[in-house]
Amino acid sequence: MVTVNEIRQAQRAEGPATVFAIGTATPQNCVEQSTYPDFYFRITNSQHKTELKEKFQRMCDKSMIKKRYMHLTEEILKENPSLCEYMAPSLDARQDMVVVEVPKLGKEAATKAIKEWGQPKSKITHLIFCTTSGVDMPGADYQLTKLLGLRPYVKRYMMYQQGCFAGGTVLRLAKDLAENNKGARVLVVCSEITAVTFRGPSDTHLDSLVGQALFGDGAAAVIVGSDPLPDVEKPLFELVWTAQTIVPDSEGAIDGHLREAGLTFHLLKDVPSLVSKNIEKALVEAFQPLNISDYNSIFWIAHPGGPAILDQVEAKLGLKQRKMQATRHVLSEYGNMSSACVLFILDEMRRKSKEDGLATTGEGLEWGVLFGFGPGLTVETVLLHSMAT
C-alpha cells in the first residue's frame, strides 16, 4: 500500500524552479517625458497653476525617465473628463477601461512568452495573474484564460492590489508551485495600466504628482517550471531562494487607497532611506549560505521605484555604477510599471548579456538578486542563479 509520504515525494519536482521564457508588452501610445508636463497640465486644464507646473517639470527632469507608454491618450481623456480632475468621482469610467485593457495587454505579453517557450499552451498547468489596476469578478485571470484559450482546468491564482513589490511575489509563488507539483508549467503575468491613478494636479497632494511623473503602463509574462526538458526548454534563470519581509517602522511609507476617484497614491519622502537602511539584512540572509559578501560580484535586478531609491542603495552598498545598468535602462525607457518592472529588467538583462557575448544570462556572473519594493513597506527578495547564454 502506498503511503502519504510516498505520494508526496512523487508529487514533487527534482530540480529548482526555472524561468524558461519572458515576454513583455506595452500600449502603442508613447509619451516623451520632456514634453509630458506641458501635455499633463493642458489636458487637466491646470495651466494656470504655474508654480505647480514648474515643480512637476523638475520632478520629470530628475526622474531619469526618457519615455513611458500609456493606454490613456488625449482622445480618451477628452472623452472622460472626470479622470482629468483632481479627486472627481470617476471609478466607473476607470473600471470600464482597465477591466478590458489589463487582460488584453497581459495576453500580448503572455503570447510572446509562450512563443519563446516553444511548447503548446495546453501544457500550462497553472496561471498567476497580478495587477494593481482595477478589480473585477471573475478576475483578470479568468479573462486571460479565455483570451489565450487555455484549458478550463488550469489552476488560477489572482493577485490584486499588491503594488510595486509584487514582481517578486509572483516569482515566489511560481517557485513554490513548480517545485511542489511535478511537471507543472506556470504562466505568470503582471499587467499594469495607469488609468486607475491618473488625475489632475493638486497643491495639497504632491505625492500624487510624484506618481504622475513616474508611472507607466506595461505587462510582462514568464513561464516557470522545474526539470527542463532537454533540448526542448531553455533555462534562463533558476529561482533558488525567496523571502518577503515588512521593513521595521515603515507603516504608511507607501499607501494606495481605492476610492470613488480611483486609486490614490501616498508616498513618504523617506522611502529611499528606509529601503537602503534595510537592504543589507536581506542580502545577508540570501547570500550568507553561499559565502558571498561582495555585492559587486552578483548581478542586480531592483524595482526602480524612482532614481533616489537606486542612488541610495548603490551608495549604501558601495555598488559600482554599472551594477544597476539593466534596472536604470528599464526605468529610462518605460518608467515605473509597478509589478511588471522587475520582469522587464529580467528580460533586458538576459537579452543584453547574450548580445554582449557574455557567458551567462546574468551579465556573465553566476549569482544575482531580484528585489521588489512596495506598500507596507514590503520587500521581496529572490535569489537567482543565471544560466548559460
Swiss-Prot record:
Gene Ontology molecular functions: naringenin-chalcone synthase activity
Alphabetical list of PROSITE patterns matching this protein: CHALCONE_SYNTH
Gene3D superfamilies: 3.40.47.10
One GO BP: polyketide biosynthetic process
Active-site residues, as the UniProt record annotates them: C164
Catalytic function, reaction form: (E)-4-coumaroyl-CoA + 3 malonyl-CoA + 3 H(+) = 2',4,4',6'-tetrahydroxychalcone + 3 CO2 + 4 CoA
Pathway: Secondary metabolite biosynthesis; flavonoid biosynthesis
Family: Belongs to the thiolase-like superfamily. Chalcone/stilbene synthases family.
Protein's job: The primary product of this enzyme is 4,2',4',6'-tetrahydroxychalcone (also termed naringenin-chalcone or chalcone) which can under specific conditions spontaneously isomerize into naringenin.
Listed name of the protein: Chalcone synthase 1A
Species of the source: Pisum sativum
